[in-house]
Amino acid sequence: MTWFIDRRLNGKNKSMVNRQRFLRRYKAQIKQSISEAINKRSVTDVDSGESVSIPTEDISEPMFHQGRGGLRHRVHPGNDHFVQNDRIERPQGGGGGSGSGQGQASQDGEGQDEFVFQISKDEYLDLLFEDLALPNLKQNQQRQLTEYKTHRAGYTANGVPANISVVRSLQNSLARRTAMTAGKRRELHALEEHLAIISNSEPAQLLEEERLRKEIAELRAKIERVPFIDTFDLRYKNYEKRPDPSSQAVMFCLMDVSGSMDQSTKDMAKRFYILLYLFLSRTYKNVEVVYIRHHTQAKEVDEHEFFYSQETGGTIVSSALKLMDEVVKERYNPAQWNIYAAQASDGDNWADDSPLCHEILAKKILPVVRYYSYIEITRRAHQTLWREYEHLQSTFDNFAMQHIRDQDDIYPVFRELFHKQNATAKD
């Protein structure tokens, strides 16, 4: 009998293959749950794991069961109401719910709650940013932006059952058994030859023959005790993420912090920028980020001040665009950098300044950037800034604009702006 002993160091992940299969099978339902859950999180907690719930009917398996129709013959215990051959009225189907606490209370029926399970931070972020990429990424001369791709990387002694290499494991098993039994097999071969000689000799040497047979049996038993396969033989296909170099890139984040931006609007803008930051840091290695806050004046700030500063004032959007243009000219040569920008505002701007914003974007910024996205966060009617930007959208293919009304719009708008296109064009 062969015994398999699990000595793997990662024994706690023995069901990982089942988990991965489950995530692949119900990816659509999981992504839907994630898109709903992200809007309920705090601004500082968008990159942790998540409890995902899936409606029971979405994970129910096909099964055979007895139908409710037709005639059936059954034997029931005796009672005071029925006698032999009486027909029993068919019970009405229960009006049960399907769990999850929806609908009115009822005295009948039964159901099941939604299936809830926990996904890790890595699984959460992988699903969150799946199929997203920086648009129009160009291969420039200096390659510092690194995107990671999964490649085969030989074999490893540890892994999940789904990645086991049967051929390599059996090769190791054969080599181990050959090495461990080579000496015994040579000794066995010599004893068998000696036994053959003695068996054919005259007179018979019964005692010597019996001794040889006993030694041969012991050697064969020792050889058979060497296990056919051992945990040391197992080899798994190894995969690793290797850097896939492409062009260097910079992302400009322009946020309106004027007095018209109330705290709720600022929080939605911060949620969008945190998603953008996580997406860039998760997908690419060397993307630089330039943070610009503006009211009547624009200022380049660090990450902490961008998200937490309380400074506010009036509204002149062109101040941020002028500062961005200055920074590009000073530090980011468009011939060597892929330049991106994401601007968030409530659309409230000094009326005479909106045409100036149109002019700066059309003549200075859009000709040198790979992609510029504008997000307007408001429930009011659009004002002059939106209307000026609409003219840009019809003229420039690398300009996109979206409208966010409440938190539920943030993630769909983000995916719409950065969904993967034929984005890695090589000019």
From Swiss-Prot:
Pfam families: DUF444. Residues 92-102 have a biased composition (Gly residues). InterPro entries: UPF0229. Residues 79-90 have a biased composition (Basic and acidic residues). It comes from the Bacteria. Residues 79-110 are annotated as: Disordered. Belongs to the UPF0229 family. This is UPF0229 protein YeaH.
